[in-house]
Swiss-Prot record:
Pfam families: Toxin_6 (PF05453). The lineage of its organism: Eukaryota, Metazoa, Ecdysozoa, Arthropoda, Chelicerata. Expressed by the venom gland. Disulfide bonds join 31-47, 34-52, 38-54. This is Potassium channel toxin alpha-KTx 9.2. It comes from the Eukaryota. Has the structural arrangement of an alpha-helix connected to a beta-sheet by disulfide bonds (CSalpha/beta). One of its GO terms (molecular function) is ion channel inhibitor activity. Belongs to the short scorpion toxin superfamily. Potassium channel inhibitor family. Alpha-KTx 09 subfamily.
Length: 56
């Protein structure tokens, strides 16, 4: 039982580390989602080579 508990703790710790390490600002947004991604940022969304650019 303690091995299972240890395994669960390791998995949870890895999930927390991955959440901290991953940078949500650098997520790639496609052209279809670009207007919704830039909404609320007072931006002019454009799509360059399939990557969304909010042009604030």
């Amino acid at each position: 039982m303690s091995r299972l508990f240890t395994l669960v703790l390791i998995v949870l710790a890895m999930n927390v580390m991955m959440a901290i390490i991953s940078d949500p600002v650098v997520e790639a947004v496609g052209c279809e989602e670009c207007p919704m991604h830039c909404k609320g940022k007072n931006a002019n969304p454009t799509c360059d080579d399939g990557v969304c650019n909010c042009n604030v």
